[in-house]
Amino acid sequence: DRYRAKEGEKISLKKFSTNCDMDVDKEYVKTVSMTAALEELSLYQAKLYAQNTYGLIIVLQAMDAAGKDGTIKHVFSHLDPNGVHVVSFKQPTTEEKDHDYMWRINKALPRRGNIGIFNRSHYEDVVVTRVHDLIENDKIPKDLVDKNIWETRYRQIRDWERYLAENGFHMVKIFLHVSKDEQRDRLAERILNKKKNWKFSIADINERRFWDRYQDLYSEMIEETSTEKAPWYIVPADNKWFTRYVVSQIVLKACLLYTSPSPR
């Protein structure tokens, strides 16, 4: 629970470390601890799948270049693909805009016994939408867009996540907390390293202008929606090896919680 945001806790991301803040040996973690964690995670994922009762949703949110894709690759690629599904949520399509903002999220929920991994999520609709005033482009009736719209959405999200938990689908939400300097370095590497050119988008550079606004809104998002049934974890993301290890431990703990000692 070291990185868990407690329900009702006042959150300011400025107060949270972006670097490895544990006294651990990097090479030992990478070669021994991580290997053991992934083996255990594979075992408990198999139990979750065999028991076919609970479903698990892992949400990854972060600033650009915080390591969402790399974390998914290194933590989840060792699991049985029959029981793991990764969904990346990008800008809503025309069809998605014709529905409520949770419609596409509901469609992507995993089956019982499965793990769904959300690369970004419904939280885009309380952060990115606000940063860029995209609510004006939505088809939501204008009389519903008032000063309380964001408080309303937070309530809707809390209610929906509680509903899922009460039906056996548990959500673990992870915010990869990267520093502005580290993000700059990673974006520069995408430009300079030909093997990473495909990752680069000029939009990532433009988004840096809104850094402070994003930090404030992500802080508010975590504060408003970290609950006992659907907690947020704020994970340092400046050291990729450490980030991946911490995420593996968080997911492993969730799998342990929702599996019986042996498959039925």
Predicted regions and their residues:
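Short beta-strand-centered segment that lines the nucleotide-binding/catalytic pocket of NTP-utilizing
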Residues: 83-92
